[in-house]
C-alpha cells in the first residue's frame, strides 16, 4: 500500500499530509540550525565524502559506496567507511568491524562493505564518533559515510546523491505521505547525482548494476546464472523488485519470488521452507547472504552485483573527487 501511495497511484496520501508538513518543517529547521551556526557540525581532520539519498527505500546506494571505495583504493587512497549501522545493535559504540563482528551487531550493509572492500569500517549512531574511532586506529586519506546526507552534525567536503532512476521521487511529498527525506531542490547543492537505472537527466550520471556469477554460501563455488534452474529468488532490500528484474534480465528461470523487508532478520527454518527440496536453488542478494551464511544450506546461492557508472562521467567524477580531496588535504595541513 505504501508503495502505491508514494508512487502517486493512490490519493490516500492526503491523509498523511499533516504529518508530512510536520516532517518537512522539522527537517528544514534542523538544516537551518546548522547553516546559521546555531548548532555546530564536527569537522574531521580528513575529508569526508557522503553518499546518500533524498528518498526512503532502496536506491542502490551501497553498491555506489563499494564502487567508490574500490576506485579510490586503486588510485592509492587509504579509505575508511562509517555508517549508522541501521538494523544492528552493538553493546557499545563506536564499533569497529573485524571478521568476528556480525550483522546483528553492525547491521548488514557495513558488514557487506567490509567484506567486499577490506576497508576499515566503523558504525555509530553519531557518525563523528565513528570517524574518530577509525582515525584513532588507522591512517586514512578519506572517510566515506554510507548514508548520512541528512546527518548535518558531521561536516562534509563532498556530497553524492543516488537516485532510483525508475521511481525517482515518487509523488514528491515528504515522509510519510511520500518518500522524500528532503525536497528535490536539495540536489542543487550536492557535488554529483548518480542515477541507478532509468534515463539520466541533464548533469546526472547514469549507473547500472551488473550481475556477477552466483556464489554458493557454503562452499564459495561460483556458477553461471545459466546453470541455475527453477530458482526461488528472495530479497530483503529496500526495493526487492529491482533484484528480481536483474535476475529476469539475466535470463534466470525463476519459479518464485519472495520479498522481505529491508534489514530483515532471518530464521533458518523460515528460509528452509522456501524451496521444495534441497535440490532447488535459493538465490538471494549479497546483502542477505551476509546474514544467512552462518546457517546456510547446500542449495543456497547469492548474486553479487557491481555498480557501473557511465563513461566518461564516471572517470570525470573520480578525477573531480581526487582534485577536491587533494585540495582539502592541503587546506588541513
From Swiss-Prot:
Key words of the record: ATP-binding, Kinase, Lipid A biosynthesis, Lipid biosynthesis, Lipid metabolism, Nucleotide-binding, Transferase
Gene Ontology terms: cellular component: plasma membrane
EC number: 2.7.1.130
Pfam families: LpxK
Positions with a binding annotation for ATP: 55-62
PANTHER family reported in the protein's UniProt record: TETRAACYLDISACCHARIDE 4'-KINASE, TETRAACYLDISACCHARIDE 4'-KINASE, MITOCHONDRIAL-RELATED
Primary enzyme class: transferase
InterPro entries: LpxK, P-loop_NTPase
General function of this protein: Transfers the gamma-phosphate of ATP to the 4'-position of a tetraacyldisaccharide 1-phosphate intermediate (termed DS-1-P) to form tetraacyldisaccharide 1,4'-bis-phosphate (lipid IVA).
Source species: Pectobacterium atrosepticum (strain SCRI 1043 / ATCC BAA-672)
Highest taxon in the source lineage: Bacteria
GO MF term (any one): ATP binding
Family statement drawn from the similarity comment of this UniProt entry: Belongs to the LpxK family.
GO biological process per UniProt: lipid A biosynthetic process; lipopolysaccharide core region biosynthetic process
NCBIfam families with a match to the protein in the record: lpxK
Protein name, per record: Tetraacyldisaccharide 4'-kinase
Catalytic activity, as annotated: a lipid A disaccharide + ATP = a lipid IVA + ADP + H(+)
Pathway annotation from the record: Glycolipid biosynthesis; lipid IV(A) biosynthesis; lipid IV(A) from (3R)-3-hydroxytetradecanoyl-[acyl-carrier-protein] and UDP-N-acetyl-alpha-D-glucosamine: step 6/6
Amino acid at each position: 500500500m505504501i508503495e502505491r501511495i508514494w508512487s502517486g497511484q493512490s490519493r490516500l496520501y492526503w491523509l498523511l499530509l499533516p504529518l508530512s508538513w510536520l516532517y518537512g518543517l522539522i527537517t528544514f529547521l534542523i538544516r537551518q540550525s546548522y547553516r546559521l551556526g546555531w548548532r555546530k557540525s564536527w569537522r574531521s581532520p580528513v575529508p569526508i565524502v557522503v553518499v546518500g539519498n533524498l528518498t526512503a527505500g532502496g536506491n542502490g546506494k551501497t553498491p555506489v559506496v563499494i564502487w567508490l571505495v574500490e576506485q579510490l583504493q586503486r588510485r592509492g587512497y587509504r579509505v575508511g567507511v562509517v555508517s549508522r549501522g541501521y538494523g544492528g545493535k552493538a553493546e557499545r559504540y563506536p564499533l569497529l568491524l573485524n571478521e568476528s563482528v556480525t550483522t546483528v551487531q553492525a547491521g548488514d550493509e557495513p558488514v557487506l562493505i567490509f567484506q567486499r572492500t577490506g576497508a576499515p569500517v566503523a558504525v555509530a549512531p553519531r557518525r563523528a564518533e565513528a570517524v574518530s574511532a577509525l582515525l584513532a586506529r588507522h591512517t586514512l586519506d578519506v572517510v566515506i559515510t554510507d548514508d548520512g546526507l541528512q546527518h548535518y552534525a558531521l561536516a562534509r567536503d563532498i556530497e553524492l546523491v543516488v537516485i532510483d532512476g525508475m521511481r525517482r521521487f515518487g509523488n514528491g511529498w515528504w515522509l510519510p505521505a511520500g518518500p522524500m527525506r528532503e525536497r528535490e531542490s536539495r540536489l542543487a547543492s550536492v557535488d554529483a547525482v548518480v542515477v541507478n537505472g532509468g534515463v539520466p537527466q541533464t548533469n546526472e550520471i547514469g549507473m547500472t548494476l551488473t550481475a556477477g556469477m552466483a556464489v554458493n554460501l557454503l562452499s564459495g563455488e561460483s556458477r553461471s546464472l545459466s546453470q541455475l534452474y527453477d530458482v526461488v529468488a528472495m530479497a530483503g532490500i529496500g526495493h526487492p523488485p529491482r533484484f528480481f528484474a536483474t535476475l529476469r534480465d539475466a535470463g534466470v528461470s525463476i519459479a518464485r519470488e519472495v520479498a522481505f523487508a529491508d534489514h530483515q532478520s532471518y530464521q533458518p527454518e523460515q528460509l528452509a521452507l522456501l524451496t521444495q527440496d534441497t535440490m532447488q536453488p535459493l538465490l538471494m542478494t549479497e546483502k542477505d547472504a551476509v546474514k544467512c551464511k552462518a546457517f546456510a544450506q547446500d542449495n543456497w546461492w547469492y548474486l553479487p552485483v557491481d555498480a557501473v557508472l557511465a563513461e566518461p562521467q564516471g572517470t570525470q567524477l573520480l578525477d573531480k573527487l581526487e582534485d577536491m580531496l587533494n585540495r582539502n588535504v592541503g587546506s588541513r595541513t
